[in-house]
Amino acid sequence: MTAQHLFQPFRLKSLELKNRIVMAPMTRSFSPEGVPTPKVADYYARRAEGEVGLIVSEGTVVNRPASSNDPNIPHFYGERPLAGWKAVIDKVRAVRGVMAPQLWHMGVVAPKPSGWLPPAPFEGPSGYVAPGKIGGVAMTEHDIAETVQAFAQAAADAKTLGFNAVEIHGAHGYLIDQFFWHPTNQRTDGYGGQTLAERARFAVEIIRAVRQAIGPDFPISLRISQWKLQDYAAKLATTPQEMEAWLVPLAEAGVDLFHCSQRRFWDPEFTGSDLNFAGWAKKLTGKSTITVGSVGLSGDFLAAFQGETSTPRSLDELLRRFDRGDFDLVAVGRPLLADAGWSRKIHEGRSSELNNFSKEALATLS
């Protein structure tokens, strides 16, 4: 099968991409005191030069006292961090790149081994870091309202700085996902509930506020997942009906693009169909979707981060699903850490030149 189909242009509202390859957001922790450095700008610009269609930044936290557990994760608020991000997007656009920041609040998380702590307790829907385990405080309705506005302000700043779209991180067991997930959301007010649709209210309010802040034509991507860092086997939606009740209100609130995170993109989401998560999200909402999960590599991220070297893998199954129309865009993570020119090599048919991935690639901004 030919990968040339991935190099068709794509348009979504004001977003125009030269191809369907997305750089997946990957935490790098190279922004001391939350400020992206010139090396961060160079790192992203190299991927733009390497023919990535859309770069989604590493998660960058919104303006809450405990939105991060790492002083080297970039902020998306404050004069110095925003100046750092302005330098990033200017450098990316200078090489005709297209980029969206991924706006993030980590929620209730474990402290880093270094012992660094934010200036306030970690916050979440009910204070749970994992099922049955308290690790922070429950947010008040005032906290929730301020967090909604923090996301909206960050999105407005992204547009002002010159980014092309914005992504909201609603996956992997972080704050928004902690509201989605019943074991970490035990609230009895309007932000809790027995159904996933009820627990999606917080995310719906964020999306609405972001849409109001950026206007109708600036695209909003929402990253979502079934799995959590706290439980890789977790399932928010166990049926297509539950998934529809979860995602349709988010689409109606303003999501243009669902970024559907799986550990392995080829895994079917429900029995009776080989559609993956992105395929079901597109079918149920009619919105464009991004698939992601071990694209182009032999092993998933867990094995890789535990020291196993991942080798290049055929794209045939990915292309079969893409050609069928299951999803619109393809996010690539670790291959782009190992090789900034991955997309160009795929485009030019140079797959024999692709690099392996090992965890040593995480040690630098190469």
Region spans (language model):
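Flavin-dependent oxidoreductase catalytic cores
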Residues: 1-366
